[in-house]
Amino acid sequence: MKKIGMIIAVEFTPFKEAYGEPEEVVKDRGFEVSIYKKDRYSLYVISSGEGEVPASICTQYLIDKYNVEMILNYGVVGALSDKLGHALTCVVKEVVDYRFDTSAIDKIPVGKHPNLPLAIPTDENLRNKALEVVPLLEVRCASGDRFVDNPKEKEAINKEFGCDICEMEAAGILLTSLRNNVPALFIKVIADTLFGGANEYADKSQTAAKECTKILEHIMDTL
């Protein structure tokens, strides 16, 4: 039986409404893991809270504690292009840690980690399996510890990094997964559009998350 680790930032309520009560809840130090047993897999779900660092810590915890074979992250995001509308569900092909910046000392471009491409690819095998189930749009994700509310800033990120969506956890999860040689898959759904912002996010994030959960189980059955 496969072991899947799932990192959820703040969208745990829609997930629980869709999946029901877990078979077991394990509290260990500052972590709380909800464990679901399915016919084809065991699912270890942890709510990390916002930000790259908490998401990275939770990723490492699931890998160390439960020996998960893959990491799945789902959640709501903001659109960086007017071509992407509310509640559009997508799969992340690449992640740019767009606020990472050591350029003053090493002349490496903003967003680029040493020994990695600027746009860090997610696991191709998991992406392809997900796409076999649902024909999702493949996107490039801008990840950084800041909620982007201003449409002009969104457009600037899109122009500089070629990113389609933005959020606050994917870079931390992906970098940690890569370090551990554990594949990661990211399924995202748009809450706030290009000209939306914090108000639209607050108003539509839970509805968008519910749409995303409808797709998750179909995908996980194939992983």
Regions found by a protein language model. Give the residues of each.
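N-terminal short beta-loop-beta anion/metal-coordinating cradle
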Residues: 1-60, 65-66
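A glycine- and small-aliphatic-rich helix-loop capping segment at beta-alpha/alpha-beta transitions
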Residues: 18-24, 65, 85-96, 207
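Active-site-proximal beta-strand elements of phosphoester/diester hydrolases
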Residues: 43-48, 140-142, 187
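Structural motif
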Residues: 69-72
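Mid-sequence, gly/pro-rich, charge-dense loop/helix-turn segments that line enzyme active sites
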Residues: 80-161
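A C-terminal functional module that forms or caps the active site or interfaces directly
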Residues: 147-195, 199
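His/Asp/Glu-rich mid-to-C-terminal helical/loop segments that flank catalytic regions of hydrolases
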Residues: 194-223
